[in-house]
A protein has these predicted regions:
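Flexible, acidic loop-helix segments that line cofactor/substrate-binding pockets
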Residues: 87-104, 219, 261-264, 271, ...
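Residue-level signal for inorganic ion chemistry
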Residues: 31, 67, 178, 211, ...
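Short coil/turn connectors at secondary-structure junctions
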Residues: 6, 148-153, 177-179, 207-209, ...
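N-terminal Rossmann-like NAD(P)+-binding subdomain of aldehyde/semialdehyde dehydrogenases
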Residues: 1-139
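Conserved small-residue-rich beta-alpha loop and adjacent elements
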Residues: 122-204
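A structured beta-alpha segment of the ubiquitous adenosine-cofactor-binding alpha/beta core
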Residues: 143-144, 211-232
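ALDH superfamily catalytic-core signature
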Residues: 202-204, 229-230, 239-299
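Hydrophobic packing residues within well-ordered alpha-helices of enzyme cores
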Residues: 89, 110, 193-196, 224, ...
Length: 299
């Protein structure tokens, strides 16, 4: 392997492990190989067990407000490292303007969910679901539903076009909900996800087992999921449907959230003729959507 190629690392069961390096990743501008990624030899079942026994156990004991403060602290930390992320992002083929929505937008997601957690959720490790129900005539027997974290792990399979936003918007949700995560970024741009992940771990803000990273194949991880796990997929419809219909997903009734082949649409009303403010705004937004990230946006 060329000395100019950097081997990425996976974060597995609390340890940074150098990738097996079977997949070369190339600079989007020069075409030169710059990184090597891979997950050969990974103990996927062990990763899930680690997340469930370590991360889940700690997160589910925390209140929503504690989790929200954790997200805010993480956002503040990552905000101080943005310039590093932008420098790495150029190798993905993105300009600073392209990466603004990815990097600043991703960190912004952490701030938003931190705020929602403090403002909209109770300072408890559970959420009341509805009002108490009187189950006996004199009120000696009362029932109350509550929502609590699942006891499994959230597995995130992400797309290539938002290596930072795609990760941060998903982990913000699962961490606030009290679940650990395993992040599997798209290999094409996973080197940017990796550098952000290193800052997440270096911050020491997240509890042990709350976050793991795979820069390469997901292997047979989905063969080890159960009904307490969640899989969140962003990518093509064909790949998403293939994963969603895996026997392990279906037989264990695993929650599977899929965002696939998403397209944006701009509609101009017939009364918005050239020369109107609406027409000018329409043209401006269409140009933006066609040029930012070369049109590879999904929001």
């Amino acid at each position: 392997m060329s000395s100019s190629v950097t081997t990425l690392s996976n974060f597995i069961m609390g340890t940074w492990v150098p990738c097996s390096g079977e997949n070369l990743l190339y600079h989007a501008v020069s075409g030169e190989p710059i990184y090597a990624a891979g997950t050969k030899g990974t103990d996927y079942a062990g990763m899930l067990a680690w997340a469930r026994s370590k991360g889940n156990r700690t997160l589910r004991k925390m209140t929503f407000h504690e989790r929200a403060r954790m997200l805010k602290a993480l956002a503040l930390h990552l905000n101080t490292k943005k310039e590093l992320f932008y420098q790495i992002s150029y190798a993905t083929g993105a300009t600073k303007g392209d990466s603004w929505i990815d990097i600043d937008g991703g960190i912004g997601n952490l701030f938003v969910y931190a705020s929602k957690g403090r403002r909209e959720l109770p300072d408890e490790p559970f959420l009341l679901d509805g009002n108490p129900e009187m189950l006996s005539k004199n009120g000696t027997f009362i029932g109350q539903h509550i929502a609590v974290p699942l006891e499994g792990c959230a597995i995130h399979i992400n797309a290539f076009n938002f290596p930072v936003w795609g990760m941060l918007e998903k982990i913000a949700v699962n961490l606030l909900a009290g679940m650990p995560c395993i992040v599997k970024p798209a290999s094409l741009t996973c080197f940017l996800t990796e550098v952000v992940s290193k800052e997440i771990i270096a911050s020491g803000i997240l509890p042990e087992g709350a976050f793991q990273l795979l820069c390469g194949s997901l292997g047979d991880m989905l063969e080890h999921v159960d009904c307490q796990d969640v899989v969140t997929f962003t990518g093509s419809a064909s790949t998403g449907m293939m994963l969603k219909n895996k026997s392990s997903i279906v037989s264990n009734a695993v929650r599977f959230n899929m965002e696939a082949d998403s397209l944006n649409c701009s509609i101009l009303g017939p009364e918005a003729a050239p020369g109107t403010e609406e027409f000018a705004l329409f043209v401006k937004e269409v140009v933006r959507e066609m040029t930012v990230k070369a049109g590879q946006k999904c929001t």
